[in-house]
């Protein structure tokens, strides 16, 4: 098991593509390789460089060079219409009486940004896969966030998404993890 981390320009993609080269030489087909990165930019760069280096077609040969969110989105058959958008968060805020001007996931790297601290805490707990109230209790709350209000808003957000048939990026990953039929990669 090898995990390669590092800042931009340190050779992560080159190192990984050299490994891909070895796997291809060992007879592993490109579609049996899962190449996942944190950002869309990095995934696109890796796919482009792999296609050039190995004479492959990005669409047909390298469908699994992508971000985890993109992979889950694709495997679950999701559409953009089924994803929470800023307008949905604003509607949720109006229904609950909390101000929300900004709330969205980056399509580049899946990070969540909101001007509402309650939503930020709910999202961060989900990303860390921590119980919401345990996460709340573990942090030094500088901003006045009420524990009970946080819990109720999190429950209401779940209900809102369910009623509307919407998901956020965290839901995608959670749903994917419970999915029975995963691709069986020879190399991940």
Where do the language-model regions lie?
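Hydrophobic alpha-helix position signal
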Residues: 23, 93, 161-162
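DNA-processing P-loop NTPase/helicase core
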Residues: 79-87, 144
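Conserved phosphoryl-transfer catalytic core
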Residues: 86-108
């Amino acid at each position: 098991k090898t995990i390669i981390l590092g800042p931009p320009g340190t050779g992560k993609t080159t190192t990984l593509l050299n490994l891909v080269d070895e796997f291809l030489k060992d007879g592993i087909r490109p579609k049996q390789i899962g190449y996942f990165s944190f950002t869309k930019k990095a995934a696109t760069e890796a796919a482009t460089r792999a296609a050039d280096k190995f004479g492959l077609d990005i669409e047909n040969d390298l469908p699994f060079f992508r971000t985890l969110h993109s992979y889950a989105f694709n495997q679950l058959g999701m559409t953009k219409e089924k994803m929470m958008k800023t307008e949905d968060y604003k509607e949720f805020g109006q229904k609950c009486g909390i101000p929300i001007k900004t709330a969205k996931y980056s399509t580049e790297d899946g990070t969540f940004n909101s001007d509402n601290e309650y939503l930020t805490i709910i999202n961060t707990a989900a990303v860390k896969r921590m119980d919401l109230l345990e996460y709340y209790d573990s942090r030094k709350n500088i901003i006045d966030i009420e524990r009970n209000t946080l819990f109720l808003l999190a429950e209401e957000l779940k209900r809102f998404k369910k009623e509307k048939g919407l998901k956020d990026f965290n839901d995608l990953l959670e749903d994917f993890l419970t999915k029975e039929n995963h691709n069986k990669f020879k190399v991940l």
